[in-house]
Amino acid sequence: MLRRETSTIYRTHKKSNSSILRSQRDQTRVDSLVEESPMGDFGINNQPTQPGVIYYFVELTNLGIQENTSSNNNNNNNHGDDENGSRYGHGSSLGGDVHSRRCS
């Protein structure tokens, strides 16, 4: 079935085998004045949303590597409680401090 706009062109157009019927569609006009929100428009258009990347940097403070893991555990357990909490496995005796930095 022909559209209303196409039917008027079909009636007024000369019939031939090589003719192409095209419908006249209303083109929506975009206003040249851009409306902004009252607080300002700070959005970025056509940018895909991606999560920020988190980089972890490990700073090695104790470079002494021991071959026997059981002696390493014994050394960690023999420290006093006043040495940066190293008895509980989160002090400098683990060999490094972890720093996180978020880059986006």
From Swiss-Prot:
GO MF, one annotated term: ubiquitin-protein transferase regulator activity
A GO CC term attached to the entry: cytoplasm
Superkingdom, taxonomy of origin: Eukaryota
GO terms (BP aspect): cellular response to stress; cellular response to water deprivation; stress-induced homeostatically regulated protein degradation pathway
Stretches for region Disordered: 1-48, 66-104
Note: Present with 149 molecules/cell in log phase SD medium.
Name of protein: Uncharacterized protein YJL144W
